[in-house]
Amino acid sequence: MKNKNIYVIAGPNGSGKTTFAMMFLPEYAKCPNFVNADLIAQGLAPFGPRAAAIKAGKLVLQQIREYAARGIDFSFETTLSGKSYVSLLTDLKAKGYSLHLFFLWIPTPELAIARIKERVAEGGHYVPAEDVRRRFVRGISNFSALYEPLFDSWMLFDNSKAKPVLISKRRNGHREVVNEKLFAVIQESARS
């Protein structure tokens, strides 16, 4: 029986999740099924995607359930700033899925806000600065406190430069830290 995999692309708003997914999923993971609330919202309301955000969120969950019912590999992106995916991922793991996380870290909410401003200028979607700041620390905190134990493997990247740089990874219960200094900074911010 083929292994079933879920690839979760996580990180703050503006950390580059969609860009990473578009490059990584087809090449590295060989996973063509990517569920993205922002892209769904843009399809529902191209001139005002924020108005379609709630409906898009519901469609994301519907698409995830559909892929899971079919037993196929898929991916989705999230900030991990909420706790709603804990039960979903637990259920999917119980159904035989292997869970893999790719967390894209950036050092400050200000960098995220600046990237979002650039994205909007290029026709992308807007996220209010107060939402970015609120979600920023919660995402890495929730990864450490809630989500990390659920994943069969994870990789933590510094995505503040042109290309993601590996900070740490865990696979088969073994964690390897590539950049001790950044990893310590991230662990400290997760406890804040």
Where are these regions (language model features)?
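Conserved lysine of the Walker
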Residues: 17
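Pre-Walker A (Motif I) flank of P-loop NTPase domains
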Residues: 2-6, 70-72
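NTP-dependent small-molecule kinase module
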Residues: 144-192
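A glycine- and Lys/Arg-enriched "phosphate-lid" helix/loop adjacent to the NTP-binding pocket
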Residues: 97-146
